[in-house]
């Protein structure tokens, strides 16, 4: 059996979600700061799921309007990385600026900032 795993799924337009290492089990929900930040053309957003749960990760503009849904699925236990290319739900590039990304599950809610620079 291989020692490395790379499981990737495209759950949204312009976003890819990867399970980092199925052997590593997080103990609590977490949403980590994206990197790089500011970013162009893409950024990575890491999040941890300690129990099988429905999880959403969404991007909002400064007016509070949802511009992209990166994850909206039942996720197994694991540490995940989203690679996002700054596209909205229709596949169009978003303008430069500050955005918020939000993770929600039944037991967790967190919001962080990211900056897209073109």
Where are these regions (language model features)?
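Short, surface-exposed loop/turn motifs with a glycine/proline- and acidic-biased composition
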Residues: 46, 71-107
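Glycine-centered coil/turn sites that cap beta-strands in beta-rich domains
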Residues: 17-35, 39-59, 69, 81-84, ...
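Short beta-strand elements
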Residues: 11-13, 114-118
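Extracellular and select intracellular beta-sandwich modules with Ser/Thr-enriched
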Residues: 2-7, 108-112
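Short, solvent-exposed loop/turn segments at the edges of extracellular beta-sandwich modules
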Residues: 1-2, 90
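Short, compositionally biased serine/threonine- and acidic-rich segments at solvent-exposed termini, linkers
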Residues: 3-22
